[in-house]
Structures are given as C-alpha cells and as structure tokens.
Amino acid sequence: MQSAATIDRFRPPMVIRAFNRFGAMLNGKVSRRIPPEELIETAKRRANLDDFGDGDFREPLGHLLESCWRDARLNAIGTIALRSDVLRILRNRLLLQRDRSLHPEIAQHQIRAPLFVVGLPRTGTTFLHTLLSADPASRAPLTWEVMEPSPPTNAEKQRRIRRASQNLACLEWVAPNFGKLHPVGAELPQECVSLMSPSFLSDQFDTMYNVPGYRKWFLQQDLQPAYEFHRRFLQHLQERENGRRWILKAPTHMFGLPTLLAIYPDALFLQTHRAPLEAITSVSSLITILRRVFSDTVDPVKIGAEAISYWWKTLAKFIGERDRLAPERIFDLSYLDLRRDPISAVRRIYQHFGWVLSPRAENRMREILAKQPADLHGFHRYEAAQFGLRPEHEQEFFGDYCERFSVGSRVSTRPVQLTSALHQSRFVRDGLG
C-alpha cells in the first residue's frame, strides 16, 4: 500500500529526473567545483560594476561553495540553481552598493521598532507574516523586490514582478505543488533571512542544500556582518516607501538575538508556539522535499536529527535571552489560537503593542483569509518516524518549553500515532508555514 505521506508522493517530474541522470553521465563536467572568484568575476562583468561595498563576503562564500562541493551531492539542477542563486546575490550586492553611492540619503533611513515574527518553523509564522503585513500601515519585504531590489524606486516595478514570477515558475516546474506546502509568489511577503544572503552568512543555503561543513562553520561566526547587511537592505527598500511599520519574519532570528538587538535596539517580537515535535517533523518534511529538487541523495532521518538538534539549542538559547526584554516588547501566540480565530489573534497582537487595527486593515486581512485554499491544512502530511523522530523526543528536548508555554503534541503519550489537535489521523497535516 502506498504511503500517504507527502515526501513519498513528492518527486521531481520525469523530465527533470532524466536531465539529472544525463548530468550525472557527464561525470563531473556539470557538477564541477565552482571557485568563488569565478562567480565574483562573472557577476562583476555582467553588472559592469566592481564595488561590493564594505564587509568580507568572500570567506563565507568560499565555505559555502566548498561545502556544496564536498557535502551536498548536487545533481545537474542543483548545480545550475546554486550557480544562478550565487550570481543573482552577488549582482544584487553590486547594484545595492551602486545605488547607495548614487543616493547617499538611503544610508540615513531609520528603521524604527520593526516587528520580528519568530518561533519554531512551521508554527504559523508565514501565515501571520502575510496577515499582519496586509495592514496599509505596515509593510513586509516582498519577494520581487528582494529578488531584484535595484533601482530603489518603483521604476520598472511591473517588469520586475513579471521576472520574479517567471523565476518562481521554474520552481513550480521542477517541484510541482511546492506552493501548497509553502506559499510562493512574486508579490507575497518574503522571509527576511534573504536580506542577509549578500553576506553569505545565512541559513537559507542550509535549507536548500545539505551543507554540514558550511553549517558547522556558520554556527560559530559573528553574525554582525549579516545583520548589518540586513539593515542596509531594509534601508534600500525603505527608499521606495518610507513611514510604514516593518513586519519581518524568520525563525532563525532566534539564533542571533543579541546581534539583532545591537542593530535594531527597539525591535519588537512576536513568538508563535506549537507542539515542537509536530513543528520539527513538518520542517523536516519540507526540507526533504526541497533538497530532493537539488540532490538525488537525500536522507530524511539525517535531516530530522539535524533539525531537532539545531532547533532545540536555538529555542533554549532564545528563551533565555528573550527574558531580558521588557514584557511589552514581546507577545506570545499559540499556533492553535491562530488557526481557530486569526482575526481575534491579530486583535490581541495589536492591543499588546498599542497599535490601531483600522477597519481597512481588518478588511484586507479578511480578504486574505477568504482566499485561503480549502485544502490548505490537508495537502502536507507527514509522520515523525520517517525522520527518525520518536514520541519521547518532545519531552526529552523540549519539556521545559512545553510546560512554560502550554504546548505539546499528543504524540508524546501515544507511541503509535502522531496526532495534531485538529486532525485525528495517522498523519499530521498543516498549511500555516
């Protein structure tokens, strides 16, 4: 009997698999080692620019490319994607520096009291990010402007949106239905970890590729250069639209809280909470599916082990550090409360931070809710055992967290079934990334 779990049903199309087999037959001619300087020189030539601005990105880029070569076992599509992504990021860095030179006022923009949505991945952070940024008084980085931020005005806006849509269509081609697992769209809010990518100090790469060498090095680094570039990127985007509240989102911010606060000392935080084993299993499933696009050798059990280790340590670190913040600067929200009544959850958030929820903002949020697919919570299905995760892991790694925030999966007391609070099934299902 065929498994109903999403990772067992989710494979690249036959034409993509055939292309990757052809690439493998070339015996290394496609997936050769890529020297950093080759990509740097190519980016400079294509942009007709040579000033990357302050900050060393060459060492991080070197570690990333070396780990991709040694560890990631990229297929032909993966090698093409890596090269394309790095060239795009390098080109954007060159263009951002040029724009900053032409428009020195960009550096004067103040990023005031940005809200960071954090929490374990797959706890509703993406959904909440989209909902909150629908308020006309707020704003999030949008996918198209993160992919193509230059120029810092609205010049060629529609053309840039079309190009971003075409790029995203490529993902849908190599990974059909991925958008049902994680929303993808040129005009949708983008996770702001992408703003750190030009520093090449970002866990965005670790999500797409199996790069344990890079990951080990990355976790030991000072993230100051990454957050400084994050601010530079936001200042650049703010040149287009100033005066609105920034709504930002990335679970990985829990890892770098002290550095984040050094850059954004008045930052606010919204932390979402879900049964940890459900969240870890869900993100392990998502990473497995994504990496299978770029590699033909993906180990779900290894992904599960890496995920629970990283997020257990990151969450424990963040909880200890967030307790030093004034209570009015952080709000806690249950994933189940968000799913039961999103508008009520938003009202509580606004009340906590002293914001005004205008009728127009609420109407726009309700429009988003009305457009949610009927099968949003049913497409992504997964079970812990596929990733080497066991019921007892929840209490073993997250017991204190579960007790403090009143979360926990029934899986912790039912070794046979993995059950979500809303779907009585052998599988957990979700859709609020």
PLM features per residue range, with description:
Residues M1-R98, N210-Y227, L237-E241, V283-G433:
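PAPS-dependent sulfotransferases, especially Golgi type II membrane carbohydrate sulfotransferases
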Residues R98-Q108:
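Pre-Walker A adenine-sensing motif
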Residues F116-D135:
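Glycine-rich phosphate-binding P-loop
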Residues V118-L120, I247-P251, Y335:
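Short His-Asn-centered micro-motif
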Residues A134-W144:
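Post-Walker A helix-loop "phosphate-sensing" segment adjacent to the P-loop in P-loop NTPases
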Residues E145-W246:
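PAPS-dependent sulfation machinery
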Residues F233, E239-D266:
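Flexible, glycine/threonine-enriched loop-and-boundary segments that flank and lead into catalytic domains
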Residues K249, L260-S285:
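Conserved phosphate-donor/acceptor-positioning beta-strand/loop module used by diverse small-molecule
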